[in-house]
């Protein structure tokens, strides 16, 4: 008989008559939480969208990748899998056909090595990874080769699906480490796949910008991490799972480099050819890209603990897709909204000072307005080159050529202007318009709330997105490109 739940949110113990049968449950009486799903995995809706709506998910992720990285039409089509990838030193389609044929034959025989990556194969290889986690202090791990005879015995056991007791002492850590590299090297394609190859080269070129908007030689780590997070989201599930296991192993190995003498850079030299390099290419084929690939592999090892988390805006987008809301912002708009909110406090402070000293009202207002516009213009100007950046810059220049942020402020003038939907127009109309209103009415609302309200309205007019159509989503790449013209006429998904 089921036990009744006591009041007060206690955790009762239910005894079904057996001494070993105990069930505990907690009743939550917090009314705001009733009817709300409790999600412990922050990427729950991301994974749900990936499995249930793969096309919608891929277009969402790829659109944000193109926001960070400039991908020409051919490279974008390669990333989407729409065209075949042209690689340096490739042996042509015939070699690919025979390689696929041999992989199918191996798969039929249940062979792990040389077969396409599967969850069953990962389960076998996980025995090696688990054993190496216990032996990270061995000097020269992954660099010193093991015994070839023992490696062949271990290889045959894995191919046959035999249970292996690696802790018996029959095999050495170097045998296991070398066999793991052999498994990765014999995959039909690199772990990070051929179609992602050019994107990884572009990620290595992401650099910071100086105050004047010029590109520097300092890597932009935040953008690189964000780009890798997005790129890993569209990896095949088996590749993503094994990559996570591998990078975590290499990260833990590098943490003990004082014992094993294997830094992240040394490990990158060992694994980049198996994880990043296209198959059937040599160092001469890659030429100047070798440094980029090795550096990129070392970067992934160092930051592996951050790379398998979906960006916050992707999580929010997936959550809203399933919870019924149709409004969502992109990463650029989230940054821009934050900038606008910061400026709203400056404008509010400016208005308070103007009401205290009416004699200098117009001059100080114009000065603070120009400063706010210059700050917003500089924030947008520092974005990486993209279509959205060009559209926003055109809005600034179209608003007023004589008052473009970054120039010397012109003579302050207070006059009625045509209604503008741009950020600069909204800021100037709010500041100057509110002054004229405050002179006529003494009971005007607080400047902080007014400034925040107008700037939030600006964000909604320029940045709100909507999932159009049914939840299945009629999301097309053009909607994912944030067309300004479409947003003014009608609202689209992205």
From Swiss-Prot:
Function field: GTPase activator for the Rho-type GTPases by converting them to an inactive GDP-bound state.
Modified residues (Phosphothreonine): 478
Family annotation (Gene3D superfamilies): Rho GTPase activation protein
GO biological process per UniProt: signal transduction
The protein's name: Rho GTPase-activating protein 19
CC per GO annotation: intracellular membrane-bounded organelle; plasma membrane
GO molecular function, one term: GTPase activator activity
Keywords: Acetylation, GTPase activation, Phosphoprotein
InterPro entries per UniProt: ARHGAP19_RhoGAP, Rho_GTPase_activation_prot, RhoGAP_dom
Annotated stretches, region: Disordered: 399-451
SMART domains: RhoGAP
A Pfam family recorded for this sequence: RhoGAP
Gene: Arhgap19
UniProt site (Arginine finger): 143
Organism: Mus musculus
């Amino acid at each position: 008989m089921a036990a009744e739940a006591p009041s007060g949110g206690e955790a009762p113990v239910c005894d079904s008559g057996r001494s070993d049968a105990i069930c505990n449950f907690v009743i939550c009486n917090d009314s705001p939480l009733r009817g709300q799903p409790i999600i412990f995995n922050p990427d729950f809706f991301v994974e749900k969208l990936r499995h249930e709506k793969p096309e919608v998910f891929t277009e969402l992720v790829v659109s944000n990748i193109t926001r960070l990285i400039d991908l020409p039409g051919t490279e974008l089509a390669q990333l989407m899998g729409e065209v075949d990838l042209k690689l340096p030193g490739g042996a042509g389609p015939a070699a690919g056909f025979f390689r696929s044929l041999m992989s199918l034959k191996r798969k039929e025989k249940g062979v792990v090595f040389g077969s396409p990556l599967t969850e069953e194969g990962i389960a076998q290889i996980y025995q090696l990874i688990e054993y190496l986690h216990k032996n990270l202090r061995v000097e020269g791990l992954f660099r010193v080769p093991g015994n070839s005879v023992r490696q062949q015995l271990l290889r045959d056991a894995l191919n046959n699906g035999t249970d292996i007791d690696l802790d018996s002492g029959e095999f050495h850590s170097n045998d296991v480490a070398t066999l793991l590299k052999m498994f990765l090297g014999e995959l039909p394609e690199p772990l990070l796949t051929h179609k992602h190859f050019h994107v990884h080269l572009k990620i290595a070129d992401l650099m910071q910008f100086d105050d004047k908007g010029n590109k520097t030689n300092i890597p932009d780590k935040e953008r690189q991490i964000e780009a890798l997070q997005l790129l890993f989201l569209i990896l095949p599930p088996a590749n993503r799972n094994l990559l996570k296991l591998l990078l975590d192993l290499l990260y833990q190995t590098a943490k003990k480099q004082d014992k094993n003498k294997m830094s992240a850079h040394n490990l990158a030299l060992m694994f980049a050819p198996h994880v990043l390099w296209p198959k059937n290419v040599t160092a001469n084929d890659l030429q100047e890209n070798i440094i980029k690939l090795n550096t990129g592999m070392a970067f992934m090892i160092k930051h592996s603990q951050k790379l398998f988390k979906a960006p916050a805006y992707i999580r929010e987008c997936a959550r809203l897709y399933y919870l019924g809301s149709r409004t969502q912002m992109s990463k650029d708009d989230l940054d821009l909204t934050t900038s606008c909110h910061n400026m709203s406090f400056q404008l509010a402070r400016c208005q308070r000072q103007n009401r205290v000293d009416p004699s200098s009202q117009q001059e100080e207002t114009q000065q603070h307005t120009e400063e706010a516009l210059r700050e917003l213009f500089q924030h947008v100007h520092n974005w990486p080159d993209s279509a959205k950046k060009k559209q926003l810059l055109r809005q600034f220049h179209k608003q007023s050529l004589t008052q473009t942020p970054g120039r010397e402020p012109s003579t302050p003038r207070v006059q009625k202007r045509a209604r503008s939907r741009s950020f600069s127009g909204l800021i100037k109309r709010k500041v100057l318009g509110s002054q004229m209103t405050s002179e006529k009415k003494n009971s005007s609302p607080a400047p902080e709330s007014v400034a925040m309200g107008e700037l939030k309205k600006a964000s909604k007019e320029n940045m709100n997105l909507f999932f159009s159509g049914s939840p299945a989503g009629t999301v097309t790449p053009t909607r994912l490109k944030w067309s300004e013209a479409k947003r003014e006429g009608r609202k689209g998904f992205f």
